Amino acid sequence: MYNFTDTNEILKSYEMGIQTTFNGKTLERELTNANGAFQTVMISGRGVVDQEHQTVDVTGRDGKVFRRKSYKEREIEITALISGINNSAFRLQFEKLNELLDTNEPSDLIFGDEPDRIYKAQFESADIPDEESNQQIIKLKMICYDPKKLTNKKTVTGNNVNYAGSKETFPKISFIVGVNVNEINLLHVEQQKYIRLKGTYIQGNRIEIDMKERTIKLNGRNELKNFDMVNSRFFSLQKGANTLRLTPSSQLTVEYSEVYQ
C-alpha cells in the first residue's frame, strides 16, 4: 500500500511554477486535481544546440578541410513530480500521462517561463524509478528533430516585413487580384528572387503562395501549372528588412513564424 501524499500545496502552487504544454494540453492542468498532481520541476536542453561538421581529409595538408556545419537534434529533458492520493489514482495518473504524450508526429511543446517560443517535439522515453510511494520524480525525454524554435503565427499587411528572427522563415503570402491580367510577379527586392505566374487572372481572384510547402493556389485550387519554374524562385524572409513588390499592385497579407536557434 502506497503512502498518502497531501497534494494541497501542489494544487495551490502549480499555477506559479513552470508549466509544460504539449500538443495543446498543459500537463499540470490535466494531471492536477483532487486525485493527484503533476508539477514540472526542471527543464534541460533549451540552451546551446550541438553542431555536426562535415570535413574532408586532404593528402599532405595538416588537419582537415571544413565543408559545412549542421545542427543536431535538440534533446529536452523534463523533470517532474507526479503523484496520486492512493495506489489506484497513481496508476491512473500514468495512464493519463501516456495518453497526453502519445502523438504521431512532432507537436508543439511550450513552457510557462518561455511562453513565446514553440519547440516541435516528439516524446521518446521516460526515466521512472521503482514505485516505492504514490509520488515520484520522473524524467521525460523529448526530441526536437528540427532544433529550431518558433513563435506563434504573425500576420503583416502590406509590402514591408521587418523580420526579427535569427533564422530564416518561409512565409505564406496571399492577395486578391486587383485587375484582369495575364501575368503576375511577386518580387523580394533585397534577395532579387521572384514568383512569376502566367495565366488568365480576373479581378477578385485569390492567390495563395506557401513558400515552405512550395505550393500556389488560385481560389483554393492548384495553380502550379501556370508557375514559371525556369525563372522563379521561392524565397524566405531574412533578419531585418524584407521588401515585397507585387505587379500588378495589390495588398499583400504575409503570415509567418519567427524562427530562433
Segments (PLM) and residue ranges:
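Short beta-strand and beta-hairpin "edge-sheet" elements
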Residues: P106-K148
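Polar/acidic, low-complexity leader/linker segments enriched in S/T/G and N/D
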Residues: M1-Q54
